């Protein structure tokens, strides 16, 4: 129809613009065959992603028809009454939105890129880390958090577990050193969606990254003797203990989360507690004598996130500010520098005390009594200290 004819048919500018705007094709990310809540298999995920990308390519390349990508978002925790939340991404943009909604184009590009990555990686049956995907296109993703966010969107729409799918895993962070072998038996799904038992071994006598494994894995220790577990905050302290391992008690396993532990380090400890507790005589956490060290220790034992990974056998043993003061008073020991608490440290210590005493004002009977007292002492002395030069005797077990 000629423009003159359109102008006669549509009297207003708004009607004319609407008539000239091409109709969009809606493409849904979630699989209709699994709307009942059952998770998709790897084969189903691959088939649906290929179909999804094929529809998008045909619309854009062959029909010059813009598309609208529709997907579900997670509801807030505890929200069961509100309807499902759907988000729509339009591509390409036109009209006044072309300049003002550039961020939507980036979202669409990230989602399509990740779907392509999943389609390429999933048939290989090998794990890929979020970090590797991020560095494959830093300009597009900008932050690793964006990769994690959109992978969660893909997993949620296919009803997949956050940790058990797509063969894309977080980069390993935690380190372990063991004087005996540790075997991890893991059930994995092949590309044909068939279960397969996989055995991974942490070899003795050298530090290594905690390997990735699923939530239902089983861990077995290659020893029949009782052992101890020492968890330290920093990699530097971990390395120092490994280099001076002869000073520690025999059969001591060393672990570090390199700061705040990732889920894999916490899951590893939880599995040790679940399957090997009869062989573990003691499990101790050592961090810096500062509020952040205490917060890191609580991440292992009393974290509000993912309670399934809490390790109840782990005990906070310090270092405590009083231990540092005692070591500085001894003649033959190297003095440890005491640092002043800054405002941020003070606020964190105060908030920790408030949260730990929220349900009980009776500190004397609290299971976290030692942690609360340590926070109070650090506030009282207005001092903190790092554990790098602490006397190695505190790690010994008699």
Swiss-Prot record:
The lineage of its organism: Eukaryota, Fungi, Dikarya, Ascomycota, Saccharomycotina. It is an enzyme of class 5 (isomerase). Changing residue 135 to F: Loss of activity. It holds the Pfam family TP6A_N. Its main location: nucleus. This is Meiosis-specific protein SPO11. PROSITE patterns: TOPO_IIB (PS52041). One of its GO terms (cellular component) is condensed nuclear chromosome. GO terms for biological process: homologous chromosome pairing at meiosis; meiosis I; meiotic DNA double-strand break formation; meiotic DNA double-strand break processing; reciprocal meiotic recombination; sporulation resulting in formation of a cellular spore; synaptonemal complex assembly. It catalyses: ATP-dependent breakage, passage and rejoining of double-stranded DNA. Its cofactor is Mg(2+). The active site is at residue 135. It is found in: Nucleus; Chromosome. One of its GO terms (molecular function) is DNA binding. Mg(2+) binds at residues 233, 288. Residues 40-175 form the Topo IIA-type catalytic domain. Belongs to the TOP6A family. Keywords: Chromosome, DNA-binding, Isomerase, Magnesium, Meiosis, Metal-binding, Nucleus, Sporulation, Topoisomerase. Required for meiotic recombination. Mediates DNA cleavage that forms the double-strand breaks (DSB) that initiate meiotic recombination. The action of SPO11 is important in setting off a regulatory chain of events encompassing 5' to 3' resection. When there are no SPO11-DSBs, resection of a site specific VDE-DSB takes place but it is faster than in wild-type meiosis and increases the risk of uncovering flanking homology. Its EC number is 5.6.2.2.
């Amino acid at each position: 129809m000629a423009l003159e004819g359109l102008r006669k048919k549509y009297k207003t500018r708004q009607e004319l613009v609407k008539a000239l705007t091409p109709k969009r094709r809606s493409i849904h990310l979630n699989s209709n065959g699994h709307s009942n809540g059952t998770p998709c298999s790897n084969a189903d995920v691959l088939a649906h992603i290929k179909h999804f990308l094929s529809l998008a390519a045909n619309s854009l390349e062959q029909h010059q028809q813009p598309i609208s990508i529709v997907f579900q978002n997670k509801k807030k925790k505890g929200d069961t009454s509100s309807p499902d939340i759907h988000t729509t991404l339009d591509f390409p943009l036109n009209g006044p939105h072309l300049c003002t909604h550039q961020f939507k184009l980036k979202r669409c590009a990230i989602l399509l890129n990740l779907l392509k990555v999943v389609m390429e990686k999933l048939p290989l049956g090998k794990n890929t880390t979020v970090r590797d995907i991020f560095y494959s296109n830093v300009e597009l993703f900008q932050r690793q958090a964006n990769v994690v966010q959109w992978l969660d969107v893909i997993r949620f729409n296919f009803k997949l577990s956050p940790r058990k799918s797509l063969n894309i895993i977080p980069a390993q962070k935690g380190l372990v050193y063991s004087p005996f072998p540790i075997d991890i038996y893991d059930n994995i799904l092949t590309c044909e969606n068939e279960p397969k038992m996989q055995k991974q071994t942490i070899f003795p006598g050298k530090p290594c990254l905690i390997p990735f494994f699923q939530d239902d894995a089983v861990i077995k220790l290659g020893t029949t003797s009782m052992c101890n577990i020492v968890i330290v905050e920093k990699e530097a302290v971990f390395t120092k203990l490994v280099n001076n391992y002869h000073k520690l008690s025999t059969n001591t396993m060393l672990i570090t989360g390199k700061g705040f532990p990732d889920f894999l380090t916490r899951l590893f400890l939880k599995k040790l507690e679940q399957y090997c507790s009869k062989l573990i005589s003691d499990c101790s956490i050592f961090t810096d004598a500062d509020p952040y060290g205490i917060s890191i220790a609580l991440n292992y034992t009393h974290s509000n996130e993912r309670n399934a990974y809490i390790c109840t056998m782990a005990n906070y043993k310090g270092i405590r500010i009083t231990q540092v003061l005692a070591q500085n008073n001894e003649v033959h020991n190297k003095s440890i520098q005491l640092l002043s608490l800054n405002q941020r440290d003070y606020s964190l210590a105060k908030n920790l005390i408030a949260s730990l005493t929220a349900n009980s004002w009776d500190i004397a009977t609290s299971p976290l009594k030692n942690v609360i007292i340590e926070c109070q002492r650090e506030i009282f002395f207005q001092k903190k200290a790092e554990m790098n030069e602490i006397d190695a005797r505190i790690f010994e077990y008699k």
